[in-house]
């Protein structure tokens, strides 16, 4: 069965660019927060830009969280969180106050210790593979992705970190726990490497 992707719509500004990428790759994608679209999808993508607390407020208001937890945590539907969509997987975020996250991957989101580097972290950076990751299959040495953020995921366990990046200090670029994947960078802005990463996600 060909993958059918639901890009979860909670008012994030980059849902259309992610949807355009899915279409460009030749797959069926729908931007939606409707239960039928979520249950009928084979894969779920949660894009995200902006602050942790604001994202969580919109997610709680606009997405059926009980259904999502059933689909993702119980039924193990493949899930990809992008940028803020990765960060909200944490237990708590500390951006403009302390805010509860989804708590799907234990950890916290804290401000980058940039050690003199300019914030926000904007631009291309090479990521460093730490553990085998199906998202990076076939990418070889081309591990250059586009980042835009000032906060980073600090997981409770380092076992979920599949790749990291250095910008002042080292922090996770890709995390994974079972069917849950998160990327701090924007694959939809990362040209061929980003396209290949999403292509690798869709057969999972």
Predicted regions and their residues:
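Cysteine-nucleophile active-site neighborhood
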Residues: 50-122
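Short hydrophobic segments within beta-strands
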Residues: 8-10
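Structural signature of beta-strand start/N-cap positions in the alpha/beta core
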Residues: 28, 43, 78-80, 144
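Extreme N-terminal starter segment of soluble prokaryotic enzymes
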Residues: 2-6
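Amide-donor transfer/coupling interface in amidating biosynthetic enzymes
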Residues: 73-74, 107-204
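Short acidic/histidine-rich motifs immediately flanking catalytic phosphotransfer sites
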Residues: 39-48
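Short acidic low-complexity segments
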Residues: 28-40
């Amino acid at each position: 069965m060909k993958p059918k992707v639901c890009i979860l719509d909670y008012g994030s500004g980059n849902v259309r660019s992610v949807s355009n990428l899915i279409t460009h790759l030749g797959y069926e994608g729908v931007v939606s927060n409707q239960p039928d679209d979520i249950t009928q999808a084979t894969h779920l993508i949660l894009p995200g830009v902006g602050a942790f607390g604001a994202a969580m407020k919109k997610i709680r208001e606009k997405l059926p969280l009980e259904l999502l937890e059933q689909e993702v945590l119980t039924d193990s539907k493949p899930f990809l969180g992008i940028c803020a969509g990765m960060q909200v997987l944490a237990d708590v975020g500390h951006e403009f106050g302390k805010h509860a996250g989804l708590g799907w991957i234990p950890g916290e989101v804290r401000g980058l210790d940039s050690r003199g580097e300019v914030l926000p972290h904007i631009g291309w950076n090479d990521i460093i593979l730490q553990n085998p990751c199906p998202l990076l299959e076939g990418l070889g040495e081309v591990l250059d992705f586009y980042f835009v953020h000032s906060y980073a995921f600090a997981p409770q366990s380092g076992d979920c970190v599949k790749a990291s990046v250095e910008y002042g200090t080292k922090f996770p670029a890709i995390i994974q726990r079972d069917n849950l994947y998160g990327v701090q960078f924007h694959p939809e802005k990362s040209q061929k490497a980003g396209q290949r990463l999403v292509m690798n996600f869709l057969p999972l």
